[in-house]
Amino acid sequence: DLAVEEFLTDKLRNLLPGSLVIGEESEDNPSDGDLLWVIDPIDGTSNFIRDIGLSVISVGLVKDGEPYLGVVYQPYRDEMFYAKTGEGAYLNGERIHVSDRDFAHSHLCSAMSLYDKRYAPPCVRIIYRVYRESDDLRPPGTAARELAYMACGRVELYFEIRIFPWDAAGAIPIIREAGGFVEILYQDKFPLDKPFAIIGANSEANFAHLKEIVME
């Protein structure tokens, strides 16, 4: 984590002079109006340590308080997901879009509140409710990867009760530019200094139903 974050921080600051970088190990203190890189050098650290092969590198650029540009790279499959607001979403140079599957035929990704087990009971309730009404559950434990997969139609639903800014900053622009819907709950803008709950879906109808379940 430390070596990759140091490498990315150096490259990104050179790419955009004056920008700040935050991640799991960074010390920059951002404020409103800053151009800010939000990075996760190894999203899915436990997967990486155990050689499961599901980890990614995630880089997001936050502009005016919102994720504006995002890159998610999956080295095990040499897959580069990327998007810039207003310019579409891509996977290895090919335009991508969310799937058109309805709720009953959707797959849900959720990591079961890995960071705080106190939230496990409500997570179980929500996941079970969604699982009963959808097609299947996929819990690989790599937030940025799962969100990027939604953008290219591999999954349709995402819910996590507590993740950190660097887990989602890179993937949010990719989902939105691919036609999907994503929302950070209980927040007016993208939080930079605290964890948050997040939901996402491939369609407006699926998003509305998922949010209804989560908010009950």
Where are the predicted features?
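N-terminal subdomain of lithium-sensitive/metallo-dependent phosphomonoesterases centered on the IMPase/IPPase/PAP
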Residues: 1-42, 205
